[in-house]
Amino acid sequence: MSGKDQNKEYRNFSKNLILWQKDFGRHNLPWQKQTNPYRVWISEIMLQQTQVKTVLPFFEKFMKKYPDIKALSKSKIEDVFELWTGLGYYRRAENIYKSSQIIRNKHNLIFPSTFEEIINLPGIGRSTAGAILSLAFNKRYAILDGNVKRVLERYFAIKAEKNIDKELWEFSENLLPKDKNNIYSQAIMDLGATICTKKTPVCEKCPVSLDCKSLKFDLTNVIPIKRKKIIKKEKDLNYLLVVKNKNLVLMQKNPSKGIWANLWTFLNFKTRDDCKKYLKKINLTPNIYNYASIQHNLTHMKLNINIYR
């Protein structure tokens, strides 16, 4: 394909997506009703590694308590954690809180509008910065979240087990329209979320299926190539449940680094014997029993948890 033909294909891709978005894209998400940088930012952080349907009630609750950066910046981090409970990946909540302090102190409570300023906020990478700039400011920046990756891999029939982010970023930037970037960015994310899904893509309803290489060569169920699963490390945790008067529980705050950083948990020890030693130290009888044993899977780690009482 000549460079001229390729440019025409890229223009058609963005043009068709923008037209499709008007009639078939998602328009009723809560962060779309009042589009401003703050709401887009919070939604994009919440949507990192989390599905839209899970995020919806948390976003509404968050906005009710913290409707703007000023309200968030005046809060306590413990209150933000409490509001985040159940959404997971608590580092995101910490980064949101830290960012609100930076925006208050360095930007006079006005959300920054340049790529350099936004990407330097805690918890914001290249794709999240691009999403904020395109969706909230209508600036010409590319995004590359999971949905967009899948659309591009299928459209260009990229069969690769290795990391191909560099190649995908090039495609993502080349496909950008000259204007209406806010509509285009929402469109390509919606396409991946509703049409070009992981399983059973609905190709007959896809606005760019005519030039889709995977559809042409019958590869839609093969691409994206399944990457090798990462073997999770295992870690043992021993929690001690100390209860007073049936309704008071002894807790400790986790360090600022590691699993569940800065969150409150039961007392945590390396071994069962360490639990007993601690009880002796605080003049309590070291008679404990295994109250519960559970396994908990994190993205990168498998936890074997023993709870003693």
List the model feature ranges, each with a label.
Residues M1-H27, Q32-K33, D190-R309:
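Intrinsically disordered, low-complexity, charged terminal extensions of DNA damage-control enzymes
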Residues N7-V202, V208-L219, I282-T285:
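Catalytic cores of DNA base-excision repair glycosylases
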